[in-house]
Amino acid sequence: MSDNEEDYDIARSLTVNLEDSDSDSGSDFSDEEQEVQDIISSEDEAEEQPKKKQKTAKPAKEAFPSLELSGDEDEQDDDKDMASYFAANNPQAKKAKAGSFQSFGLSKLVLTNIAKKGYRQPTPIQRKTIPLIMANRDVVGMARTGSGKTAAFTLPVIEKLKGHSARVGIRAIILSPSRELALQTYKQVKEFSKGSDLRAIVLTGGDSLEDQFSSMVSNPDIVIATPGRFLHLQVEMQLDLKTVEYIVFDEADHLFEQGFAEQLNELLAVLPPQRQSLLFSATLPRSLVDFAKAGLSNPVLVRLDADSKISDQLQMAFFTTKKNEREANLLYVLQEVIKMPLGTAEQIKKLRLMDKRVNDEAEEEELENESGSKRKYKFKKERLPSANVLPSPHSTIVFVPTKHHVEYITTLLRDAGYLVSYIYGTLDQHARKNQLYQFRLGMTTVLVVTDVAARGIDIPVLANVVNYTLPGSSKIFIHRVGRTARAGNKGWAYSIVNEKELPYLLDLELFLGKKILLTAMQEQKCQLLKDKQGDNYVEPKVQYTDRLVLGSCPRLSLETFEELYENLLRNHYELSVIKEVAAKGEKLYYRTRKAASTESVKRAKEIMDTGTWDDQHLLFGPNLEKEKEKFLAKLANRHVKETVFEFNKKGNDRDEDSLVSFMHRRRKQLAPIQRRASERRDLLQREREAGLTHGIEDEILKAHGETGYSASGINDVDEEELQNAFEDADQLSSKSNKKNYRDDRFFISHYAPASVIQDQQLNITSSFANEAASATFDLDNDDKIGNGKQVMQWDRKKGKYINSQSTDKKFIIGESGAKIPATYRSGKFDEWKKKRNMQPAKVGSLETEGESKQRFKHKRNAAPKLPDKYRDDYHKQKKKVEKAVESGRDVKGYHKPGQRSEIKSTEDIRKARLLKEKKMAKNARPSRKRK
């Protein structure tokens, strides 16, 4: 490895960018496939032609313009272009500073709420998308997790809706893939619309249908929902969505991967055609491009951070592990690397007390649902810290593959003394909120989750992310580590990798464009620099943001944590039982995991053959045990090696033994093969040091569009393909197309295009419509992998085999012609209406005067009880009684002095006479005694 490897890569990348720009300017455009349409560009043309006039927009049906942000140095020019472009639509923007919230033409109410949230300047995605949404354009927004996509669509929607409409009907729908993300979006909508009379509700699975019926009848303006529950209510209540003005698909790629394709298609069929559609996602597979063309009208594509898939402030470290040492590595990372403090007795006691209170509240809620009464007292919760404050200095998320691993790792860490919360897909909603609340409050420092937490859980700032296992997809890895290093903050991502996961790490290397750095490579580079520079040598720093640094934890320290883990496993029977269950779930998980690429598997074998892939990690400094390891390596590589057949055989015994002679002949046969393999390894090592190695990963450094370290960005659709799909009207009118020597219709490269590998990694499923429901990236089914393998089962009642996977469910035909389970229209809403004797207003009609968004919880105005002199609250209760009497209520048994009249009423006199007659009749009986 040469000492100027880093500079060489930079020079190559610059050359690639120059070649890209030349090829882009001379690329061919097909008039038969696409139509000309406007584009808003954020390139350096603003500096060269500052007085260039804006061109009018030209409509197109199948393409949408591209809006990119190339870097921070171009943001000021982009802001000027955007401000001038939308000056006609936003008169207030002329006086405001370009690129600020005021320049978007937002109302004073919205700007005040933005200031209360602490936001001063919009993020790049907000700066680009908000003016477009305000201009009534359909937008496809694309930026990484944590870049402010939620506020990018909530602010303009609130601004355009302004206030509550007296006409009945939903005006805006926001669809989210998970309950957590829906609740997070609802929270932001309420905060940004504070002070207005806009009505917003949230509809998620797991909540009461009757409460959601009440919310829908209250005529909301904005509905934030998960697709499954919203479609359920739409079919059950037979909702008319003709008043919908805005539809937002948040985390759109995840909506399809999670199996919501049928629900989305059904909802699109009932939406009005004149709606404004917004689609936001962290990634944009080619399938979503097709969906955007079909479901959106003349959309604009906004792409940010096209050259970086993860935050440039994120530092990553990858720790190698042996087969049974993954738990010990996790304990070592938490204790020695992150410096995670153990929980004190007071903290553990406080945490248990809160769990007990929450359980009591859950039981009370169940009793309320059964009896209909309201509880008298609710425990007061502490206020959460602000969005830009860490819950704790060591707050860490640990990602595990399945639900069983969540239970196993949670039990292990709690036994080790850590304060742990946990979340998985099928966890009860009440328990999920409590666990997240404890972590947000800082009462727990570790949150163990499955991939369901990679999106949607509202944790604004996080210190560390730990991958207990490396995910099988580079896309999942991006969304995992996207939880930290947000909003300009630094963060660490630690991953534990075994030899079976090494090919996936090499896939990640190609996907991110960041090379793997081994300890031996760094030491060799330092030695070359030391020999070259002499006394002026300064050891280069390891860039954990630019390289994937791979190595192992210190062996001596790791053995200590291995002993700790063995002791915990021995002393806790429950932990050993959960471990067995997690091991079975892990087998099913690996069985359904997507296979790594063939090239990465080959490279992984080459790296493991070198024997240096599990050297001590550079994060822990020099290895003090290296001399000992070198000595052991010499013993392992000794020339005279004896097998068990030859051991302790000497002299004539050695010559006469048939097994000894057999091993001698075997060595002669293998000697040429071993010699050739050794020569090949030495040759590869010398070529690698001299920089002569030429593989697929090196081809990309000099040719555009080949496999290897690509700089095409987070989307799997490369730049050349996007330019062919979505034409640029300015380039067509101002530049003449140059002819290319190759015809794309017939040219076949001898290397696979870079888009093929990235398409495989971004598109977790091969088919958009048919295979979305059975996607391997199914975050909610983290405990159901591999279920339902047996198809035919014996039915004792029917006396024959039946299909166990078939059900007797009945279906109804939806608006789009697709079949929907008949349970969606079960008649519960009709029963609810009949019980309350009400009829919902017709969509489009005006609200009646009695309608209100408020729900009256208390209708009775009962008088207080009489005060008891022997109770502590006697005086307090006495004041309540006196106040009730003054207000005109009758308190039974209480009579104020002078309040009662001495004159009896006719009714009292009549009752007294009857009572007297009864007494006389009773007392006037003849005596039973004898006279």
Swiss-Prot record:
Q: Which InterPro entries match?
A: DBP10_C, DDX54/DBP10_DEAD-box_helicase, DEAD/DEAH_box_helicase_dom, DEAD_box_RNA_helicase, Helicase_ATP-bd, Helicase_C-like, P-loop_NTPase, RNA_helicase_DEAD_Q_motif
Q: Where in the cell is it found?
A: Nucleus, Nucleolus
Region annotation (Disordered) maps to: 1-78, 836-910
* Ranges where the Helicase ATP-binding domain occurs: 130-302
User: What are the alphabetically sorted keywords of the record?
Assistant: ATP-binding, Helicase, Hydrolase, Nucleotide-binding, Nucleus, Ribosome biogenesis, RNA-binding, rRNA processing
| Motif Q motif positions after renumbering to this chain | 99-127
What Gene Ontology terms for biological process does this UniProt record contain?
assembly of large subunit precursor of preribosome; maturation of 5.8S rRNA from tricistronic rRNA transcript (SSU-rRNA, 5.8S rRNA, LSU-rRNA); maturation of LSU-rRNA from tricistronic rRNA transcript (SSU-rRNA, 5.8S rRNA, LSU-rRNA)
Show the ranges annotated as biased composition (Acidic residues): 19-47
Q: Which GO terms describe its cellular component?
A: cytosol; nucleolus; preribosome, large subunit precursor
Basic and acidic residues bias (residue ranges) = 866-875, 882-910
| Top-level taxon | Eukaryota
Q: Does the keyword Transport apply?
A: no
Cross-referenced SMART domains, in alphabetical order? Answer: DBP10CT, DEXDc, HELICc
Stretches that traverse the bilayer: none
Location (main, coarse): nucleus
Q: Which Pfam families match?
A: DBP10CT, DEAD, Helicase_C
EC numbers for this chain: 3.6.4.13
Main enzyme class = hydrolase
* Residues reported in the UniProt entry to bind ATP: A143, R144, T145, G146, S147, G148, K149, T150
The family note in this entry says: Belongs to the DEAD box helicase family. DDX54/DBP10 subfamily.
Q: What is this protein called?
A: ATP-dependent RNA helicase DBP10
